[in-house]
Amino acid sequence: MISSDAKVKIQNFGRFLSNMVMPNIGAFIAWGFITALFIPTGWVPNETLASLVGPMITYLLPLLIGYTGGKLAGGERGAVVGAITTMGVIVGTDIPMFMGAMIVGPMGGWAIKAFDKKIDGKVRSGFEMLVNNFSAGIIGMLCAIIAFFLIGPFVKVLSGALAAGVNFLVTAHLLPLTSIFVEPAKILFLNNAINHGIFSPLGIQQASETGQSIFFLIEANPGPGLGILLAYMVFGKGTARQTAGGATIIHFFGGIHEIYFPYILMNPRLILAAIAGGMTGVFTLTVFNAGLVSPASPGSIFAVLLMTNKGSILGVVCSIFAAAAVSFTVAALLMKAQTSTEQDGDKDALVKATSIMQEMKAGSKGQAAPTATQSKKIDMANVQSIIVACDAGMGSSAMGASMLRKKIQEVGLPVTVTNMAINSLPAHVDMVITHQDLTDRARQHAPNAEHISLNNFLDSALYNQLVTQLLAAKRQAANDSQLIKPSILAANDDRYEVQQPSVFQLQKENIHLGLNAKNKEEAIRFAGNKLVELGYVHPEYVDAMFEREKLVSTYLGESIAVPHGTVDAKDRVIKTGIVICQYPQGVAFSEDSGDVAKLVIGIAAKNDEHIQVITTITNALDDPNAIDKLTSTKDVSDVLSILATSQAA
């Protein structure tokens, strides 16, 4: 079994390769569209526009990769030197230099970074610009010459050897066997390394010669994962069955393949279904001689079809659904073959199987069974920022962060939740949540954070438990009586409810109905000015409300926004209070068309009293009728009555 250290090193290497490709995927897609549309075998052949294909694949795409690789290794100066070096390897050969760009781009960045480190503090004042500019030019020139004479020819020979190996696999009908290695590697979060580090360079080279490539769909085929998720929908139990439907939509239409990984990790025998489906998909592609014109990212059915030329549509569609059918059949047989002991009383299959899988994996490493543990204990009352991180920082972590953010917003905790790639983790974050296979890497980038490992980014139970712990710690620290009445049972624990008197009294002058505003800035300023008029804040607090809105939208959902000042502006609060501003026509609080606030509640609170202030308002969220009444009534007495009931709850 692969060791933890080895897996982390492989993941880091793969992540580095994919980091060179992923930021430029839009350029690959643009080239793919041009190829699919305008080449002689395209949908709308056009000789003039087809002339874009050659220069883009020869110069633009490798230069972008080299620039990005240089930036990863040596910052902005490294990016420039990386691009110069890449030009050497491009001109030194007569084939597309994607693999060469992945080598020489970081090499150029590393060279200038090493030079800068060597002369740091040794350049006389006034000569910095001269040294910086000429050093980049000279080092770039030398690296380009080396790339031209040495690295370019070497990569050409290497590419030829790889092409010969690929041709052998194709002619010997052995290409489907690659799924034996690809599918398990995907589950270990090596999918980006495989797709963008191996298959994309091979695929681009093949596509430049034949107009399409099978390599773009070996890893990106959504069929194997689709079949496994469908099997869970039919034969699964408990949470696994309940969540499989939503996961299927996200996987197949959204293209986020990581969503199905936990379903295999909880039942490792299903890797056989993924392998069988993958082999079927590759075999079908070889039979139809089908492929894509460019990488499909994300691996959505829509992205795949858009990157398919008209001659391969049938083959690509058949490969996807054939792979899904085979993986579904194998997964169904494996799931039905489970013993009755495994099935009886199993009302929460996902949680139970995940626990078993954790124990098995920990036992193989000679460790105790992993749980949602932390690498470094911190005071939960001091947690202000949580980052949900994954390999690419786009798909699975974005969903997890969205789910956790909603729960935290629902209970009014002053904690920010974001998502990002592991390699981009900042050092100052309080808490990091990752898949357990990625936690070791996350610890390297954020060693001072508290790390929580999970097996499924949609693990609602774990998020509920975390919110409960944060609530308990912050209530105890601030002696708060009532935060927002939680809409999640795990966070609604009577042990933490302590009755205390309200910190403000809502009066008619606090309520303003039937307002209109052109934008959220106008609505926020109106609320801020009313806070000033009522003697709650100093005028400077209004500017702080705009500063707070720039950080993250104060729109909570359910047609409610709660603009308030920054933490630094609390000294401009005279006393705790609120103003309720009703906008029946709504005010857009973000570019999201759904974030329209009809209640804009300006808040001013001293210390941590704002949590109690929000409580009085958001207790009404449990009653949809109350929300409708608050956003449409023309009688101030209705508002006072509803909120008085909420405050007493």
Swiss-Prot record:
PROSITE patterns per the UniProt record, alphabetical: PTS_EIIA_TYPE_2 (PS51094), PTS_EIIA_TYPE_2_HIS (PS00372), PTS_EIIB_TYPE_2 (PS51099), PTS_EIIC_TYPE_2 (PS51104)
Residues passing through the membrane, by range: 25-46, 51-71, 135-156, 166-186, 274-293, 314-335
CDD domains: PTS_IIA_fru, PTS_IIB_mannitol
Site feature location: Stabilizes the transition state in the phosphoryl transfer from HPr to EIIA: 548
Active site: 390 (phosphocysteine intermediate), 564 (tele-phosphohistidine intermediate)
PTM annotation (Phosphohistidine): residues: 564
Membrane topology type: Multi-pass membrane protein
Purpose: The phosphoenolpyruvate-dependent sugar phosphotransferase system (sugar PTS), a major carbohydrate active transport system, catalyzes the phosphorylation of incoming sugar substrates concomitantly with their translocation across the cell membrane. This system is involved in D-mannitol transport.
UniProt note: domains: The EIIC type-2 domain forms the PTS system translocation channel and contains the specific substrate-binding site. The PTS EIIB type-2 domain is phosphorylated by phospho-EIIA on a cysteinyl residue. Then, it transfers the phosphoryl group to the sugar substrate concomitantly with the sugar uptake processed by the PTS EIIC type-2 domain.
UniProt protein name: PTS system mannitol-specific EIICBA component
Source taxonomy: Bacteria, Pseudomonadati, Pseudomonadota, Gammaproteobacteria, Vibrionales
Gene behind this protein: mtlA
